[in-house]
């Protein structure tokens, strides 16, 4: 997997990674499969109860959550719903931008209600469905993508923080968000397995 730390550290933007590493559409496909396969691997030894186990998370703070859920620890099902939605959003942006659609600013995002992912089978299904969707978005790229077409930033702060976002940069942004949640997913799993072992 590509090292996203230069972006998270504020040293580079996503478009810099694309340019400097000459990332191709096939690379984006490979990264997608690598991330999905990694997450599926994390689920190999979990059970249904682990998917809905609510971990303790002292850092939990989601200002976008519904009232009363801002400070809850995220279950494995919640995390999978969230990271797949963000990666699919990045892939959807990439399709629009690569095809030359102009004035792209509204977020093409849908997040599966996390409480619906309440079994291991549903978590696996959501991941495989997300793989299918992301790869399908990449298949919509034309032979000559419009790399000079950029997402319209809604705020100056967004533009300053993320930089210019063309098709590959938008895809990388969604994937980086997913990778950034790996440790949280592993910790939620660790707590779930520990709780089951002592039950």
Residue ranges and their predicted role:
Residues 1-77, 81, 86-199:
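Aromatic-glycine hotspot motif
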